[in-house]
């Protein structure tokens, strides 16, 4: 372990304007590093003075690798921090640059599902499971007034039930069907892909359905905290921070099959595996009435994330800096 001197890390990340609907996982990574008194550097000319390079956007690998070789710096990759590292094809998730990941020094992920996905994708670099996403109750406090921000924005009564539906553009029809099946519940469809303004026009004829392209920063905390449930229609959902925040808020999650974060959902919250059809989701929502939310499992998981010394991301970084560098 290195000394307690202030760490300087180079954060290699490039925002993709096409990713407007995605949750900004890299923002939570920045917040985590700052909470650990880590200095974040983004100017390439400062790499020489950094302790390590954190590679979030894989297409920047060639550029940072040259600097890493010149100044003898290690590269730790965080592939699930940027949706641009993947593409979807026929309901499959495809890693866009396996070669880059096999040339870094270490890969950090947050779940077993993410690690298994990389191994199945022929990634042979050592992979470490460590948490940098801190759940809402460990990084901020939300006042009773702030909890109403989400409802006020959409004009939802505070005593009404609202359900957040997360999915890509092609899942919107399922949200339409759900809203028509349950007129007494408000559904907010958050498009986590590039989005379609046409869908917003459609909601004008469905009074209990709203459409958003991505979740606004000012609405996110109150939306998660006040939701009656979260429905995830995207099979390759990868944003662990959303899962942790739902767990911290005791919000049940309904999902079909989520390989990347499914185990963690089931370990920490009321989880209902549902059919993909709107009817199947509707029946699962009905089951929630007979399935009281338990705070025991969520408390256990969040305490583990807070206290588990073996899974602290900052310690992983420090250990990697001092370990011998292997030639790739």
Regions found by a protein language model. Give the residues of each.
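Conserved donor-binding/catalytic core segment of Leloir-type glycosyltransferases
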Residues: 157-173, 188
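Conserved acidic donor-binding segment of nucleotide-sugar-dependent glycosyltransferases
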Residues: 270-279, 287-292
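A short helix/loop element that forms part of the nucleotide-sugar donor recognition site in Leloir-type
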Residues: 141-156, 294
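Nucleotide-activated donor-binding/catalytic signature segment of Leloir-type glycosyltransferases, i.e.
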Residues: 198-215
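Short hydrophobic beta-strand element within catalytic cores of glycosyltransferases
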Residues: 252-255
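Aromatic "clamp/platform" in nucleotide-sugar-dependent glycosyltransferases that forms part
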Residues: 234-236
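C-terminal alpha-helical cap of glycosyltransferases
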Residues: 284-291, 304-328
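A short, active-site helix/loop in glycosyltransferases that binds the activated sugar's phosphate group
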Residues: 103-126
């Amino acid at each position: 372990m290195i000394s307690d001197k202030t760490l300087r890390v180079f954060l290699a990340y490039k925002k993709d304007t096409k990713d407007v609907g995605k949750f900004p996982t890299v923002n939570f990574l920045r917040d985590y590093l700052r909470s650990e008194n880590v200095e974040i550097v983004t100017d390439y000319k400062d790499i020489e003075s950094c302790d390590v390079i954190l590679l979030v956007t894989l297409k920047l690998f060639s550029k940072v690798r040259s600097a890493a070789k010149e100044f003898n710096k290690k590269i730790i990759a965080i592939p699930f921090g940027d949706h641009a590292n993947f593409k979807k094809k026929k309901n499959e998730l495809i890693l866009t640059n396996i070669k880059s990941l096999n040339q870094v020094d270490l890969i950090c992920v947050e779940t077993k599902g993410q690690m298994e996905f990389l191994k199945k994708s022929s990634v042979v670099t050592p992979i470490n499971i460590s948490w940098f996403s801190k759940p809402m109750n460990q990084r901020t406090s939300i006042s009773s007034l702030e909890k109403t921000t989400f409802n006020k924005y959409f004009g939802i009564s505070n005593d009404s039930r609202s359900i957040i539906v997360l999915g890509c553009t092609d899942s919107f029809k399922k949200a339409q069907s759900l809203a028509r099946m349950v007129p007494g519940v408000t559904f907010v469809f958050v498009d986590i892909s590039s989005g379609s303004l046409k869908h917003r026009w459609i909601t004008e004829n469905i009074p209990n359905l709203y459409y958003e392209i991505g979740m606004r920063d000012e609405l996110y905390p109150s939306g998660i905290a006040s939701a009656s449930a979260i429905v995830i229609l995207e099979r390759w959902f990868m944003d662990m921070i959303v899962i942790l925040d739902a767990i911290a808020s005791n919000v049940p999650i309904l999902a079909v099959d989520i390989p990347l974060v499914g185990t963690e959902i089931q370990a920490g919250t009321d989880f209902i595996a549902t059919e993909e059809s709107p009817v199947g989701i509707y029946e699962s929502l009905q089951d929630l009435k007979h399935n009281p939310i338990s705070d025991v499992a969520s408390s256990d998981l969040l305490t583990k994330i807070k206290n588990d010394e073996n899974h602290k991301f900052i310690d992983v970084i420090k250990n990697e800096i001092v370990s011998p560098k292997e030639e790739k």
